[in-house]
Curated annotation (Swiss-Prot):
Its cofactor is pyridoxal 5'-phosphate. SUPFAM superfamilies: PLP-dependent transferases. One of its GO terms (cellular component) is cytoplasm. The keyword Ubl conjugation does not apply. The modification N6-(pyridoxal phosphate)lysine is found at residue 212. NCBIfam families: met_gam_lyase, PRK07503.1. This is L-methionine gamma-lyase.
Length: 399
């Protein structure tokens, strides 16, 4: 880490880490290096770059000064050694899988996963000889029993998308590290490093869809991996350079760093509004249950209090009346937008059974915790009174 900034607080690092305006012609905002390639002063220097003996940049698919600043800043926020930036969260996840897994290896994943990650596992690496095992990671005995000689990776989200199930990061990491060469990879998109830092709890690799809260404005797609230097080097040179080519543009890296500067402020607002909405939903007669880590009624409330700074801006709840109720509620919303994704200023709502998981059979949805009346809210930054009023009028229209 940069000695000048490493001991500052979270928001100070998010704004300043790794950059000195006086070393950049006084430019307060880091310059954007919009170039695909870089000139070498000598042939010998170029040879050193290709051999990894020189630290200079030579092609943006591998490195770029704008991306390098973003990567170092994200590593500082996650308290990791190094970061690698990608053009999407799925690019980050795919590069991590393709780099660290080989045919014949096993990966153990939580039963509930983001739909595109599920597809990558079963229609991507699963078709190239990697064995995928699904377990309920809230059951540590089930997890431990699933680990075998070929297991190379444990992967999960916490909270899980979309049902908000938590996984005990420290406990899973402790189990994993009793086995040699077993890597724990965590998708930290829902929390960001402001709310949760998995590397500090024993995880080996953190992945993000930086499209979401890190960016915060729903105007780019991006992904980031943070891990130790040796793994980051492999993921960059194999997963990014050779296997996926999922390169983040310098302009989008600039926008992402701009969003990260206000991350703490935004997350505080997302969390405070979500807490109020979750309580309102819990008290509503049309709601069967609410899954929100900030509610004392949440089954994993104690775990949330241990490993998360705040409970986050995502809420899952079940409407009485199943599929029909869920669709009526969704169609009646006026301020919440019916859309996938999360983490922007705008509040979003989605009905997984009708939207993201509509291609699953009823049995498949039940297996993965996707019930018919499940609604997921991504609480934005609007005035809380307006959000509450929109939910209330949609409930009345649904009835």
């Amino acid at each position: 880490m940069n000695d000048k900034h490493k001991n500052f607080g979270f928001s100070t690092r998010a704004i300043h880490y790794g950059y000195n305006a006086l070393e950049n012609n006084g430019a307060l905002i880091p310059p954007v290096y919009m170039t695909s390639t870089f000139a070498f002063p000598t042939v010998e220097y170029g040879a050193g770059c290709f051999a990894g003996e020189e630290s200079g940049h030579f092609y943006t698919r591998i490195s770029n000064p704008t991306l390098a600043l973003l990567e170092s800043r994200m590593a500082a926020l996650e308290n990791g050694e190094a970061g690698v930036a990608f053009s999407s969260g799925m690019g980050a996840i795919a590069a991590t899988f393709w780099t660290l897994l080989r045919p014949g290896d096993e990966i153990i994943v939580n039963r509930t996963l983001y739909g595109c990650t599920f597809a990558l596992l079963h229609h991507g690496i699963g078709e190239f000889g990697v064995v995928v095992k699904h377990v309920d990671m809230s059951n540590l005995a089930e997890l431990e029993a699933a680990i075998g000689p070929a297991t190379r990776m444990i992967y999960f989200e916490t909270p899980a998308n979309p049902n908000m199930q938590l996984v005990d990061i420290a406990a899973v990491s402790a189990i994993a590290h009793t086995h040699n060469d077993l890597i724990v990879v965590i998708d930290n998109t829902y929390c960001t490093p402001y709310l949760q830092r998995p590397l500090e709890l024993g995880a080996d690799v953190v992945v993000h869809s930086a499209t979401k809260y890190l960016s915060g404005h729903s105007d780019i797609t991006a992904g980031v991996v943070v891990t130790r230097q040796s793994l980051a080097d492999r993921i960059r040179l194999q997963g990014l350079k050779d296997l996926t080519g999922a390169v983040l543009s310098p302009h989008d890296a600039h926008l992402l760093m701009r969003g990260i500067k206000t991350l703490a402020l935004r997350m505080d607002r997302h969390c405070s509004s979500a807490q109020v909405i979750a309580q309102m939903l819990q008290d509503h007669p049309a709601v069967e249950w609410v899954a929100y880590p900030g509610l004392p009624s949440f089954p994993q409330y104690a775990l949330a209090s241990r490993q998360m700074k705040l409970p986050g801006g995502m809420i899952a709840f079940e409407l009485k009346g199943g599929m029909a109720a869920g669709q009526r509620f969704m169609n009646a919303l006026q301020l919440f937008s019916r859309a996938v994704s999360l983490g922007g200023a705008e509040s979003l709502a989605q009905h997984p059974a009708s939207m993201t998981h509509s291609t699953y059979t009823l049995e498949e949805r039940a297996k993965h915790g996707i019930s018919e009346g499940l609604v997921r809210l991504a609480v934005g930054l609007e005035d809380i009174a307006d959000l509450l009023a929109d939910i209330e009028q949609a409930m009345k229209a649904m009835a």
